[in-house]
């Protein structure tokens, strides 16, 4: 997979690409990440890429020509172009899976200042937001999107690890514990020490449903539960009701 990021702050991504799973994926050639400095496509001798807003308004807007010229150079018939924008669809695990599985070439455009000239939208396949809040620029959001996608590329991390992550199955992950077994009078649940894999799996399934119900009940609205999960969920609701 090739990911190309268009930004006015190319150095922002250096440490991101030099650490952890991203670095491993790059070293293993599971992914290529190319950073493009938008200023290099400026038609201004001072490499200016922003200008005042037509009709008046506060702040500066990223210009259309640099983005257009950059896309003319790097876009291919296989490319998908996304613009990081507060107006975009909220990025989620479903989208991450879709891009990791079906997009050999992804181009990410980072907005800044007051946004981008609206004419670039003609060349964008999807606008994406990472949440209903304001960031200084699209670079932080780009690292979120790239990290979520890259870790799903086959071979980057163990399949079992990615498969069991929160949100991957539409639910939050069950609680996890490590040594010591007892600390500050807090004990690891005994079932996890039993060695009974069936009981452990049942416990994890129930805890996953319970945590999702308590912390992110909205996830259960569109989640297609199995018959077993439906029974467990009703048990959880009754237990919580009895303990309230």
Swiss-Prot record:
Belongs to the RNA methyltransferase TrmD family. Gene3D superfamilies: 3.40.1280.10, tRNA(m1g37)methyltransferase, domain 2. This is tRNA (guanine-N(1)-)-methyltransferase. NCBIfam families: PRK00026.1, trmD. The keyword Transferase applies. The keyword Transferase applies. It comes from Phytoplasma australiense. It is found in: Cytoplasm. GO terms for biological process: tRNA N1-guanine methylation. Homodimer. It catalyses: guanosine(37) in tRNA + S-adenosyl-L-methionine = N(1)-methylguanosine(37) in tRNA + S-adenosyl-L-homocysteine + H(+). Specifically methylates guanosine-37 in various tRNAs. One of its GO terms (molecular function) is tRNA (guanine(37)-N1)-methyltransferase activity. CDD domains: TrmD-like. GO terms for cellular component: cytosol. HAMAP family: TrmD. It holds the Pfam family tRNA_m1G_MT. Its EC number is 2.1.1.228. Keywords: Cytoplasm, Methyltransferase, S-adenosyl-L-methionine, Transferase, tRNA processing. S-adenosyl-L-methionine binds at residues 111, 130-135.
